[in-house]
Amino acid sequence: MSREALINRITNETKIQIALNLDGGKLELKESIFPNQSIIIDEHHAKQVSGSQYINVQTGIGFLDHMIHALAKHSGWSLIVECIGDLHIDDHHTAEDVGISLGMAFKQALGQIKGVKRFGHGFAPLDEALSRAVVDLSNRPFAVIELGLKREKIGDLSTEMIPHVLESFAGAVGITIHVDCLRGFNDHHRAESAFKALAIAIKEAISKTGKNDIPSTKGVLSK
């Protein structure tokens, strides 16, 4: 059974469309939310196409695109993210709503937590930076994010929004994540290693076991 999802989320602050396949492969949208797709696609978005993955992330915030691209790539997903947000105000609504919408898509694509490992962990270095992530597909939304970022912004993304994106994602999915940057002095490296570590942990947690059981002593995974 294909683990795919399509999410459309519209508020007064953002308009978002996400297509996700947790196992990679071909992915496409029937219709873009952008009025003129050829104008939107430029050097500021993250796109990568291979035989096993299709990734195209366009949030309007370059560094957010870069982080979500890294998350998708190392999780093994195929992912399309389109967002039109009120960036004339600031980056908050766009970053938060993309995190929420991505979480909604992940939850829909994963379906019942059954026949998967449930737990995952990962370490990822980027030069001097090293991050650790641990994931529990618990249906218990909780996020502990400690990245130690010092700059006010990386590109056009406020550093305070980087952990908030991950918190919003975990809350929308209903999972527990712990993400820590253990060392590093370059904030770009610290953030990117954190997203890559989370990707590795997620890839393990959603991997199929070949069984059809619910990975819980309770026999259920629900609030």
UniProtKB/Swiss-Prot annotation:
Its Gene Ontology biological processes? Answer: L-histidine biosynthetic process
- Alphabetically list the UniProt keywords: Amino-acid biosynthesis, Histidine biosynthesis, Lyase
Q: Which Pfam families match?
A: IGPD
Q: According to its UniProt record, which reaction does this protein catalyse?
A: D-erythro-1-(imidazol-4-yl)glycerol 3-phosphate = 3-(imidazol-4-yl)-2-oxopropyl phosphate + H2O
Give the record's pathway.
Amino-acid biosynthesis; L-histidine biosynthesis; L-histidine from 5-phospho-alpha-D-ribose 1-diphosphate: step 6/9
The cross-references to Gene3D superfamilies, in alphabetical order and at most eight, read: Imidazole glycerol phosphate dehydratase, domain 1 (3.30.230.40)
InterPro entries for this protein? IGPD_sf, ImidazoleglycerolP_deHydtase, ImidazoleglycerP_deHydtase_CS, Ribosomal_Su5_D2-typ_SF
EC numbers listed for it are 4.2.1.19
Q: Would I find Protein transport among this entry's keywords?
A: no
Task: State the top-level EC class.
Answer: lyase
The molecular function terms of the Gene Ontology recorded here are:
imidazoleglycerol-phosphate dehydratase activity
CDD domains this protein is in?
IGPD
Q: Lyase: present as a keyword of the record?
A: yes
* Protein family membership: Belongs to the imidazoleglycerol-phosphate dehydratase family.
What's the protein here called? Imidazoleglycerol-phosphate dehydratase
What lineage, starting at the top, does this entry show?
Eukaryota, Fungi, Dikarya, Ascomycota, Saccharomycotina
